A protein has these predicted regions:
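Conserved SAM/SAH-binding loop
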Residues: 70
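SAM-dependent methyltransferase
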Residues: 2, 151-213
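A short glycine-rich, Lys/Arg-flanked "PGG" loop and its adjoining helix->strand segment in the class I
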Residues: 139-152
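N-terminal auxiliary segments of SAM/dcSAM-dependent transferases
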Residues: 1-26
Length: 241
């Protein structure tokens, strides 16, 4: 990643150091919006939604935290006694995670995980990081790759947003826009901006619980539990078959 592309990392680093920062999200249909802000990446367990607290209780053994960011989930799991490896594509976010006390962090994309990292009992993709699967095709490829780095009774703990739980016209129109292009309704193409920084464009996959179950068919994984929030966010426990 080039220095000027680490918008996410820069906002996280500035918030960590100075308590300032914001996050602008630009979608490929022209929608520009402010996210909840970098403070969300530093929340403690007491601030998490009930759906997340229920799901994270199913973590066991050695953990791979995919898209660890500033390390909020890694830190919690470390305190619970888990051996955690956090990975993130953002060098600055990884730096912040280390500064905050995450013992093992690597700068790498999820597509590069391999048996060289060892064997994991749980993979966590929280903070809506189910989205890192990006598309139906890539999800199935990654799920197969995950089988090569996990124990026989492994779990994947995920969090995402049900894209259909909205009545906002610009989101509903975007679903139609995606389907016309042969994409999943919640297959969002976006980039993050902060000051003069901008990430490359990337896909971020949002799915309903039913779509998640369909996506996992034939992959050697299954959705075991779903925990809904009062809004569109939900978490799920995925088990290896």
């Amino acid at each position: 990643m080039k220095k000027g592309q680490d918008a996410y990392g820069r906002e996280v680093y500035d918030y960590f150091k100075h308590g300032t920062g914001c996050e602008i999200v630009e979608r490929d249909d022209g929608l520009v919006s402010m996210s909840t802000g970098p403070d969300a990446y530093f929340t403690e367990y007491r601030d998490w939604g009930a759906h997340l607290k229920k799901a994270i209780a199913f973590v066991r053994g050695r953990v791979l935290d995919v898209g660890c960011g500033a390390g909020r989930h890694s830190l919690y799991l470390q305190k619970k006694g888990h051996d955690v490896l956090g990975i993130d594509t953002s060098p600055l976010a990884a730096k912040v995670a280390r500064l905050r006390g995450v013992k093992r962090v690597r700068v790498m994309p999820v597509t590069k995980v391999s048996s060289r990292l060892g064997t994991f009992d749980t993979i966590v993709m929280l903070g809506n990081n189910f989205g890192l699967f990006e598309s139906r095709k890539r999800a199935r490829w990654l799920l197969n790759r995950f089988r090569s780095i996990t124990s026989e009774d492994a779990r994947i703990i995920v969090e995402t947003v049900d894209p259909y739980r909205t009545d906002e016209r610009h989101h509903l129109n975007y679903h139609k826009f995606n389907r016309r292009r042969g994409r999943m309704s919640g297959q969002t193409r976006l980039r993050v901006r902060y000051l003069t920084y901008a990430t490359p464009w990337f896909d971020y996959l949002l799915v309903s619980p039913d779509e998640m179950k369909q996506l996992l068919e034939g992959t050697g994984w299954r959705v075991a539990k779903v925990f809904r929030s009062k809004g569109p966010a939900y978490s799920a426990v995925i088990e290896r078959l």
